């Protein structure tokens, strides 16, 4: 969150289940707008749906994964720059592949996302590809002298241990706050 908060207006957490478990984060928590834990695409779709429901004067929503501690600090800036060449859905790419949960989503795509979910689509990458998403390349980042994929994902205890080993004690404490 600390990597994205200076670059966006409001931060909102998408999570299903009891929202009070995230109270210490001080964020609004929204659940998927479709039932039955319909996968990552439902989480992505929750953002544009929230903006449309609130009738906010926004054209795009940025989504990031909460378990990716090294994502680039210039992510939003570079996504916005990509819009200048082609105003559409923008997603991240690195040497490890496409990372479509990291995206800049046009609010106008909310009905199409909802339709895709109702038709059984669950994969963010497959849907983004169908939409002709623009991919923005991000090179490896240096973390304590080691080059790592900027979208390194903490998907288990061993990944968490690896991420903690890469962080300085100061950065680790800042991330815990």
Question: Predicted segment positions?
Answer:
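Nucleotide and nucleotide-moiety/phosphate-recognizing core
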Residues: 1-150, 161-175
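Active-site rim beta-loop-alpha module in soluble metabolic enzymes
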Residues: 155
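Conserved active-site and cofactor/substrate-binding residues in soluble primary-metabolism enzymes
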Residues: 158
């Amino acid at each position: 969150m600390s990597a994205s908060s200076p670059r966006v207006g409001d931060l909102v957490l998408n999570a299903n289940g009891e929202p009070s478990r995230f109270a210490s984060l001080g964020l609004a928590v929204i659940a998927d707008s479709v039932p039955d834990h319909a996968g990552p695409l439902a989480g992505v779709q929750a953002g544009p749906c929230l903006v449309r429901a609130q009738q906010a004067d926004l054209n795009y929503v940025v989504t990031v994964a909460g378990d990716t501690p090294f994502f680039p600090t210039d992510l939003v800036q570079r996504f916005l720059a990509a819009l200048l060449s082609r105003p559409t859905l923008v997603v991240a790419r690195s040497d490890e592949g496409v990372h479509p949960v990291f995206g800049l989503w046009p609010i106008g795509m909310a009905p199409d996302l909802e339709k895709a979910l109702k038709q059984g689509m669950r994969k963010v990458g497959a849907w983004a590809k169908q939409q002709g998403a623009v991919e923005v390349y991000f090179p490896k980042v240096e973390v304590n002298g080691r080059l790592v994929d900027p979208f390194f994902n903490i998907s288990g205890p061993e990944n968490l241990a690896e991420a903690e080993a890469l962080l300085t004690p100061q950065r680790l404490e800042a991330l815990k706050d």
